[in-house]
Amino acid sequence: MSWHDVLFGFDGRIGRKTFWIALVAVMAVELGCHAIAAAIEGERLTSIVSLAFSYPEFAIMAKRGHDRGMPTVIPGAFFAISVVIDFLFVIGAAGTSEEPSALLLVLTVPWLIFALALIVDLGFRPGTPGPNRWGPAPASGRPHGNGRAE
């Protein structure tokens, strides 16, 4: 599977190694963009940056979820909450860092629990052995599909 497919496609499965490499790389770039956005504009632009990075993060988590036998709707629900939280910041309805809105607080607690559960499940538990409805098991450390190492 190419890196383009890992970052932007929703078909297939990826193993834990590819999941961690892709997720950490995307989040590192996102963090750098957040720093630049915060220096320029603040929370609103930072939230727009988060929205832009939601797509590749969702694609990565969806494919890793496929390897675990998880339907796309589970990481999709997580990202739906993420998008709502970011949108609250973009429209100015999230309050401030000192006084967050009640809606933001109500959404943030389940989001944090969901995030922790997804990271544990996707990042540390092995995938389903053999093929499943999303394709063959990713070959850990061996060439897979297009000859690139998984």
Q: What do the PLM-derived regions correspond to, one by one?
A:
Residues M1-V29, E57-T72, V120-E150:
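Membrane-interface extramembranous regions at the lipid-water interface
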Residues V29-P56, F78-A115, E150:
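Membrane-helix interface segments in multi-pass membrane proteins
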Residues T72-F78:
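Pore- or pathway-lining transmembrane helices of multi-pass membrane proteins that form conduits
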